[in-house]
């Protein structure tokens, strides 16, 4: 699915219908904070653990996920390797494991992150928990690599076209680039 194509709703709605907490692995702190803020704004208990937090803050958030009725926990792939995370995660009732930006797991991907390779180990700690991998950018080779590295038994792929009706590419030839740019910007709302 393309960026802005509704990937978050593909896991948020099912997780809300299930008992337990949904762990979302994502590499971007800004995205974590944005998602948590949006969920909290509509009354859904969500939290994120990211670099810069103290050990005590991390432990508090993890304990809140065990005992506090949280529905969503956003973490970086690097966090999955820590002992404290693994110990606390085993005490959680995890209903869904989501890997966002899953193209980062593939060495064929443009944005490979070695820490994503540890996600398969997390699957071993959460037997029977469904896993969903999401990305807006994956070639067929990367899709296959994602499925192999995450040990998917059944390979289900849902794709949406990158073509967006609300986007257009136009080439304008002009001698006066600055005035043309100012004119175009004046026509664009926002």
Predicted regions and their residues:
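Motif I (Walker A/P-loop) of helicase-class P-loop NTPases
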Residues: 6-16, 32, 115
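Post-DEXD/H (motif II) to motif III coupling segment of the RecA-like Helicase ATP-binding lobe
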Residues: 90-99, 103-160, 178, 182
